[in-house]
Amino acid sequence: MIKEVYLIRHSKPLKVNNDKNMDSLQIQNEKQPLSIEGENIAREKLNIKELKDIDKLYSSSYVRAISTAKYIAENNNIEINVINDFGERKFGINSWDELPDNFGEKQFLDENYKTEFGESQKEVRERTFNALMNVLKNDDKKIAIVFHSTAMLFLLMTWCKVIPDKDKYNVIFNNNIVFYGKYFDYCKIFKLTFNDKNKLINIENIKHD
């Protein structure tokens, strides 16, 4: 049975001043809601034909992901199933000042690079891949998953070559460029098609109208 999985980045979050916030940086990140603009982006960009007749909807546990997923849930009259393992990469720091210089570049080039308490590229990829494989064990044919930009890129690197080009990068699957740019836009959608043995056979970059 062919299965279609739509990987969707969350919409635009709200920026707030956390100087007096006693929560850990990780909890602050997980609690970050969508901005008004983010709500409007999600409402518009997720109301497309590709995201109709979804059998099962998943989201990370982050507030901005669930808040994005609710538009797909409403359009399809289905519930949101929360899975923690679709969450974003964990930095493992207490303040942004602790993040090493050129952290993103170093982690991109070395799959095992991480802070002492954070996650490596490889760990994020394995975590999200295992979660996806568990989802594919079910009989649902059309699945939507809302999660996060870096986690999505690291997951795609399971099957794709990612080649830097100055400040942008190419994501290549089976010698076809499926993405070229600096980052995934808010509500970016990739359609992954799996065969009856849960082997990935195609990746499509879904364009918004």
Predicted regions and their residues:
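Beta-strand elements within well-structured catalytic alpha/beta cores of enzymes
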Residues: 4-8, 58, 141-147, 151
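Short, solvent-exposed loop/turn segments at secondary-structure junctions
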Residues: 11-14, 62-64, 87-88, 149-152, ...
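Phosphate-handling substructures
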Residues: 14, 28-33, 74-129, 180-184
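Generic structural signal for well-ordered alpha-helical scaffold segments
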Residues: 43-47, 129-137
